[in-house]
Swiss-Prot record:
It catalyses: L-serine + hexadecanoyl-CoA + H(+) = 3-oxosphinganine + CO2 + CoA; octadecanoyl-CoA + L-serine + H(+) = 3-oxoeicosasphinganine + CO2 + CoA. It is found in: Endoplasmic reticulum membrane. Induction: Expression at protein level is highly increased in brains of patients with Alzheimer disease. No changes are observed at mRNA level. This is Serine palmitoyltransferase 2. Changing residue 302 to A: Reduces the dimerization propensity with SPTLC1; reduces the dimerization propensity with SPTLC1. Does not impair enzymatic activity. The gene is SPTLC2.
């Protein structure tokens, strides 16, 4: 779908399930569709720009509605599995079937239960049937291809034994290796090895004591320049960057407005903060604006005092949906209602934007409009850890108040060097164009892979520019079947079901990489097509008409005069 003539590229298109657009951003303000149409007629549309240039891409996200028959059959499938689960529990109770799962001791029957009834039931009767699809051990670099250690289970997936065989050259469609820096050769590896010889593997101290290396300060200065912010701070763990820093930013008397599909690290951080939490519908600006209005009008519960702070939590790319945050509209609402914005760019930094600077650059926005810019080094940079960027006052405050900064040990020196070298490569400071080529290759792979899957008839979620590609499976039996069939064909994929997704929205999640060649993608697509026919997964009623292959070039992000 393309925007109307004269329309803004950031307009949200109508979803395949019939959901309508929630309005548009025009000149920094949220305007209704009617107002936007009137402005367009008057020739007053102001496009979102990047450094004075026009961002011309349509903002297309597809969330096709689950076909009614598929939804019914999915519920029936869960019903049958539940029925057999109760039957097996009955057999276990009478010692007819061997019991492998953890049970409460009779002596502790009056204690608070360690296991919630439904979760325990789901784990032993549904999850165990397909447990072999997760926690598969690999024994190689997580590049475009990986080696997987083969294992077997003789007790219905309650335990596994290694066979000693190695499945070689499995196409890796599951790792977050977006720019292909997860490798054991090249400049990054050589630089990390050199630093390992000089500094060793660990620091054995916190930053505030004797664990603050010159490499750490070099990294933080580089991250700040990369993001276009005043200062930045690096942390040893991406998950802890969220969960340990949010409590330092807000507390009792503050309000957190969180997207309903935010990552578990954001959810945990919000809960640990002690602030009041309210949830808005995923990427829905009407829902967010209503919560903002209510927060200002009604204030805190009981006392009706104004909130000390209102913090909006969003992600750049949502890792289960493949959707991209509607950042221009979030920023417009944040400014309008004087809230703060916390942006998690774990999946979007390096993967979006003409030069890989994330969702802020993708929309051509000013980094200063985002109060807290968070991201991780675990994905596009092929390393570990996370960062927070923003104003110098913010970073100075976090250095003394963040649990992750004060109590956690510092990043490993070779890991720091891996991040520095890969980031300089992306920025072009290594004297080559390799980084830019990787960003371009990822964008090309993303659009090609998504388009081909839609042409085959699969239901694909998310934004067309997102390298996270969810393929909907729906039925519980097809979760395990898809993962096993793909591995038989030497394709490693991630399959996801409840409770990580809604109960009828099980899916396979592909993560694309700049390391994937067209031959690798074509091989994977061929096998996906065959498995899709075998398992009858082609549910889409909006199959795309195949197009001629068109190369991805710089005109995709063409800058023009307004």
């Amino acid at each position: 779908m393309r925007p109307e003539p004269g329309g803004c590229c950031c307009r949200r298109t109508v979803r395949a399930n019939g959901c309508v657009a929630n309005g548009e951003v025009r000149n920094g303000y949220v305007r209704s569709s009617a107002a936007a149409a009137a402005a367009a007629a008057a020739g007053q549309i102001h496009h979102v720009t990047q450094n004075g240039g026009l961002y011309k891409r349509p903002f297309n996200e597809a969330f096709e509605e689950t076909p009614m028959l598929v939804a019914v059959l999915t519920y029936v499938g869960y019903g049958v599995l539940t029925l057999f689960g109760y039957l097996r529990d009955f057999l276990r109770y009478w010692r007819i079937e061997k019991c492998h799962h953890a049970t409460e001791r009779e002596e502790q029957k009056d204690f608070v239960s360690l296991y919630q009834d439904f979760e325990n039931f789901y784990t032993r009767n549904l999850y165990m049937r397909i447990r072999d699809n997760w926690n598969r051990p690999i024994c190689s670099v997580p590049g475009a291809r990986v080696d997987i250690m083969e294992r077997q289970s003789h007790d219905y997936n309650w335990s596994f034994k290694y066979t000693g065989n190695i499945i070689k050259g499995v196409i890796n469609m599951g790792s977050y290796n977006y720019l292909g820096f997860a490798r054991n050769t090249g400049s990054c590896q050589e630089a990390a090895a050199k630093v390992l010889e000089e500094y060793g593997a660990g620091v054995c101290s916190t930053r505030q004591e004797i664990g603050n290396l010159d490499k750490h300060e070099e990294l933080e200065e580089l991250v700040a320049r990369f993001l276009g912010v005043e200062a930045a701070m690096a942390y040893g763990m991406g998950f802890a960057t969220n969960s340990m820093n949010i409590p330092a930013l807000v507390g009792k008397g503050c309000l957190i407005l969180s997207d309903e599909l935010n990552h578990a690290s954001l959810v945990l951080g919000a809960r640990l903060s002690g602030a009041t939490i309210r949830i808005f519908k995923h990427n829905n600006m009407q829902s967010l604006e209503k919560l903002l209005k209510d927060a200002i009008v009604y204030g805190q519960p009981r006392t009706r005092r104004p909130w000390k702070k209102i913090l909006i939590l969003v992600e750049g790319i949502y890792s289960m949906e493949g959707s991209i945050v509607r950042l221009p509209e979030v920023i417009a609402l944040k400014k309008k209602y004087k809230a703060y914005l916390y942006l998690d760019e774990a999946h979007s930094i390096g993967a979006l934007g003409p030069t890989g600077r994330g969702v802020v650059e993708y929309f051509g926005l000013d980094p200063e409009d985002v109060d807290v810019m968070m991201g991780t080094f675990t994905k596009s940079f092929g390393a570990s850890g996370g960062y927070i960027g923003g104003k110098k006052e913010l970073i100075d405050y976090l250095r003394t108040h963040s649990h992750s900064a004060v109590y956690a040990t510092s990043l490993s020196p070779p890991v720091v060097e891996q991040i520095i070298t890969s980031m300089k490569c992306i920025m072009g400071q290594d004297g080559t164009s390799l980084g830019k080529e990787c960003v371009q290759q990822l964008a090309e792979n993303t659009r090609y892979f998504r388009r081909r899957l839609k042409e085959m008839g699969f239901i694909i979620y998310g934004n067309e520019d997102s390298p996270v590609v969810p393929l909907m499976l729906y039925m519980p039996a097809k979760i395990g079947a898809f993962g096993r069939e793909m591995l038989k064909r030497n394709i490693g994929v991630v399959v996801v079901g409840f409770p990580a997704t809604p109960i009828i929205e099980s899916r396979a999640r592909f993560c694309l990489s700049a390391a994937h060649t067209k031959e690798i993608l074509d091989t994977a697509l061929k096998e996906i097509d065959e498995v899709g026919d075998l398992l009858q997964l082609k549910y889409s009623r909006h199959r795309l008409v195949p197009l001629l292959d068109r190369p991805f070039d710089e005109t995709t992000y063409e800058e023009t005069e307004d």
